[in-house]
Amino acid sequence: MSDVNAWWVGGSLLLGIWAIVVFFSPDPLAQYPVINSKRPGELFYTQSKIRFITQARSLLKEGLSKTNNAFRLVTNNRILLVLHSKYRNELRDHKSLNNTKPPEDDFFGWLQGFEPFNHVKTNPKVFAAMVRTKLTPSIGAVGIPLSEETDFVLQQQLTDSPEWHQINVKETSLQLVARLSARIFLGPQVCRNPAWIGIMINYTVEAFMTAERLRMWPRWLLWLVHWFLPSCKKLRSQVQEARGIISQVLQQRERNRKRAFLETEASDEVDTVQWLEDCAKGGYYDPALLQMGLAVVATHTSADLLSQVIFDLCEHPELLQPLREEIVTVITQHGWSKNAIYNLKLLDSVLKESQRLKPMQIISLYRYVTADITLSDGTLIPKGTYIAMIDDHSLDPNSSYTNGDRYDGYRFINMREVPERSHQTQLVSVSSDHTGFGFGNHACPGRFFAATELKIALCHLLLKYDLKLGDQKPQAMTYGFGLSSDPFTQISVRRRQEEISLAGSKS
C-alpha cells in the first residue's frame, strides 16, 4: 500500500470513529424539551426556524407551561437553552458566562466585512472602560455640544416650516442619534460627514440582512461563500471606507497635538479618541472597528427608543404640555448641566415607560457557557451551551407592575415615592423587572450617555415642534426575540415657537 493510500485509509478511519462517537454520545441537554422541534414530515429545521422568527413570544410561553426550569428553542442561529427567570440572580454575574461570543458567532465576526463583531479586534473592554471612567464622569461637559448639534440636525430634518408636514420617525431618529453620537466620539467635522453617517446607519442593517443570507449555507463553507455574495462585498467596502475616514481623523488630531505643543497651547477638543488610547494601556484595539462596533450596538438601539417615545407621545398628547413645562423650568435653572439631565424626571419616566412596554428584546442574559454550571436546584448547564433568560415582564407586563399593559408616562416618577422600588425608577437603573439596558455586571455601560443624548434630543423636539399622528397607528415589528419600533409610520410636525433658547444654554 502506498503512503498516499495509507494516509487516506487512516484519515477515513479516524473520521468514521469520530462520527460514531458523536452520533452515539448522549446529548447532555436531552432532558430539556425542544419546543419547536421538527414536525412529522419535516426533514430539516427550516420550518422550526420560521416558527421561531414569527412566533417566538408564544413559543416562550409554551415552554414556560411545560417546564419550570429550562427548555430549548430552535432559533435562526442555533438550538438555544432558555432558562426560567428564577435563575437570574444566580447567573447574572457568573464567571463562566461569556457575553461577547454569542454576537460574534451570530454575525460571523471571523469573516472579512464582519470585523466590527469580532471582540478581539474591537476590544470592547477598551470602550467600556472609556465610557465608565472617562465619559460618564464628564456627562456635564457634553450637554452644550449635543444641544448645538441637535439644533442643527432638527433644522435640517424637520425644517422651520410652521405648516404641518410629514416625516418618517425612524429615519429622522437614526439621523439624529448617529449625528449626536459622532459629535461626541469623533468631533464636529466627522458628525457632519455624510459618508460616515451613512456607514453608522447602513452598516448595521446590511450586516443583519447579510448574516441571514449566510445562515442558509453550511457553516464550513462560509469562508468561501462570503467572497462571492454581493452583500458581503458591500460590507467589506464599508469597513474599508470607515478605516479611511478614521485614519484621516487620527492624522488630523496628531497634527493638532503637535501644533498645540509647539504653540504651548492645550487642544480644545473633547478628547474621546485620546481617552480610548489611554484606556487601551498599550493593548491592541482597532479605532475604526471600535467606532463601527459602537454604531452596531448603540446607534440603532438609541434611535429605536427615541422613535418609540415619539410615537407614544403622539398617542398620549396629554403629556406634551407637562413635559414642556418641566423642560423650561429645568433648563432655565440648570442649563445643560448634569443636574439638568437628572432633574428632567417626567421626561426620564416617559423614556423608561416606552422602553418597558417596547424593549429591543423579549429575552435577556444571552450568553455562552465556558464551563459546566450546576445551579442551586441541581439544574445542569453543560459547557459549550448557548443560553438566554426568560424576561417575565416582556411576556406579561402585568407580572411586575399594576396595570402594566397600559402606558403611563408618570409610572416611574410616582414610583420614586415607593421606598422599596425607588432605586429602580431612573431610566439608567437596571433591575430584574426592567432589563432594557441589561442586568448585572454586563449592563450597558453607555446607558448614562444614551439617556443624556435622548433627553437633549427630546427637549429640542418637544419645545420646537408640534407633533401628531396620522390615520396609521404605529406597530412594532417582531423578528424572533427582537422588537423594533415601526420603521414605516409617519407623523405630522410643524414648527412652534420655543419658550426659551436651547442650543447653547449654559449652567
UniProtKB/Swiss-Prot annotation:
<dbReference type="GO" id="GO:0020037">
    <property type="term" value="F:heme binding"/>
</dbReference>
<comment type="function">
    <text>Cytochrome P450 monooxygenase; part of the gene cluster that mediates the biosynthesis of the indole diterpenes penitrems. The geranylgeranyl diphosphate (GGPP) synthase ptmG catalyzes the first step in penitrem biosynthesis via conversion of farnesyl pyrophosphate and isopentyl pyrophosphate into geranylgeranyl pyrophosphate (GGPP). Condensation of indole-3-glycerol phosphate with GGPP by the prenyl transferase ptmC then forms 3-geranylgeranylindole (3-GGI).</text>
</comment>
<dbReference type="InterPro" id="IPR036396">
    <property type="entry name" value="Cyt_P450_sf"/>
</dbReference>
<keyword id="KW-0349">Heme</keyword>
<keyword id="KW-0325">Glycoprotein</keyword>
<protein>
    <recommendedName>
        <fullName>Cytochrome P450 monooxygenase ptmU</fullName>
        <ecNumber>1.-.-.-</ecNumber>
    </recommendedName>
</protein>
<dbReference type="GO" id="GO:0043386">
    <property type="term" value="P:mycotoxin biosynthetic process"/>
</dbReference>
<feature type="binding site" description="axial binding residue">
    <location>
        <position position="444"/>
    </location>
    <ligand>
        <name>heme</name>
    </ligand>
</feature>
<feature type="glycosylation site" description="N-linked (GlcNAc...) asparagine">
    <location>
        <position position="202"/>
    </location>
</feature>
<feature type="glycosylation site" description="N-linked (GlcNAc...) asparagine">
    <location>
        <position position="98"/>
    </location>
</feature>
<dbReference type="InterPro" id="IPR001128">
    <property type="entry name" value="Cyt_P450"/>
</dbReference>
<dbReference type="InterPro" id="IPR002403">
    <property type="entry name" value="Cyt_P450_E_grp-IV"/>
</dbReference>
<comment type="pathway">
    <text>Secondary metabolite biosynthesis.</text>
</comment>
<feature type="transmembrane region" description="Helical">
    <location>
        <begin position="4"/>
        <end position="24"/>
    </location>
</feature>
<feature type="glycosylation site" description="N-linked (GlcNAc...) asparagine">
    <location>
        <position position="398"/>
    </location>
</feature>
<keyword id="KW-0408">Iron</keyword>
<keyword id="KW-1133">Transmembrane helix</keyword>
<dbReference type="Pfam" id="PF00067">
    <property type="entry name" value="p450"/>
</dbReference>
<dbReference type="GO" id="GO:0016020">
    <property type="term" value="C:membrane"/>
</dbReference>
<comment type="similarity">
    <text>Belongs to the cytochrome P450 family.</text>
</comment>
<dbReference type="InterPro" id="IPR017972">
    <property type="entry name" value="Cyt_P450_CS"/>
</dbReference>
<dbReference type="GO" id="GO:0005506">
    <property type="term" value="F:iron ion binding"/>
</dbReference>
<keyword id="KW-0472">Membrane</keyword>
<dbReference type="GO" id="GO:0016705">
    <property type="term" value="F:oxidoreductase activity, acting on paired donors, with incorporation or reduction of molecular oxygen"/>
</dbReference>
<keyword id="KW-0503">Monooxygenase</keyword>
<keyword id="KW-0479">Metal-binding</keyword>
<keyword id="KW-0560">Oxidoreductase</keyword>
<dbReference type="GO" id="GO:0004497">
    <property type="term" value="F:monooxygenase activity"/>
</dbReference>
<keyword id="KW-0812">Transmembrane</keyword>
